[in-house]
Amino acid sequence: MTGGYQRVDDAGPEQLAAMRDLAGRLWSWSSRWHPGELAWFWYEHGGPDPAWRTAYWRHRGEVVAWAWDRGGRLDLQLDPSHLALTAQVVAWFGGHTVTVLDAETELIDALGEHGYARRDDDRFFAHLRRPLDGLPAAAPLPDGYTWRPPDAAARAAIHSVAFGVTMSEAVYRGIQRAPSYRPELDQLIVAPDGTPAASALAWVDGDAAVLEPVGTSPEHRRRGLAGAASLAALRAARDLGARDARVCARGDDGYPAARAAYEALGFRVYARNARLVRPA
């Protein structure tokens, strides 16, 4: 314990619980992290890469910071009332690249005191927001397409083809066991031949929802399916008490399609991720 702070390393599921606890307590539209997407990022590959280090810090029994070293790139969250802890987090990390939200100005300044300066990539993620009042009513799907309950096999299949990755049914079952997963927020559309065509998953914490992920099979794109699935998930989130929703998409011009699709649903950019680098 240093300076009244207790660090816990590589705690497995306890780490995720600590991350979600802090993200929920600190959530605002100036926060990078929503508790729901943390659950998704933790479980989407069946758990974190064993080579990636994690830690969280407590002060008087309360989680006040967490850090996730993802192969030499740091993701973190730090209670603004405990910015003095920045030195310990940076020392634990020992690396050179940190990603933050550009609205986290106090954290950016604190990291700057330890040599980190903004140096953005050509690629970055934008954060978009929309209120959940005034959502359009559900429209009919294209001929032959239907809604289907989100069984794990179908959801893993659509995620795999939509994002060009391999996700197993067992991994998706793990996602469905996450405490914050709600099946009514998990929307699945199937094609006329019964194969999965598009999906959207929302997560709700308090009055804020986040969409993560949204995807469409390449052969079924440009039919409005991702938009329909997203709106269905947002309506379900509103029914659970959410008042606003956020989604992240590439904000650079190298991949504008997703951002444009969300803007067509009424989302507007309000912040972006920023990369901070400390010279070697």
Where are the regions that the model predicts?
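Conserved acetyl-CoA-binding loop-helix of GNAT-fold acetyltransferases
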Residues: 82-94, 213-216, 222-239, 259-264
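C-terminal "cap" of GNAT-fold acetyltransferases
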Residues: 125-146, 243-259, 265-280
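Conserved active-site alpha-helix within GNAT-family acetyltransferase domains
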Residues: 102-121, 227, 251-271
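Cytosolic beta-strand hydrophobic patch enriched in CBS
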Residues: 54-58, 186-190, 245-246
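Short amphipathic alpha-helix that is part of the acyltransferase structural core
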Residues: 1-41, 138-169
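A conserved beta-strand-loop-helix scaffold within acyl/acetyltransferase catalytic domains
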Residues: 38, 44-45, 68-72, 164-217
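Conserved GNAT acetyl-CoA-binding A-motif
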Residues: 94-103, 237-251
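Acyl-donor-binding surface of acyltransferase catalytic domains
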Residues: 1, 63, 70-143, 274-278
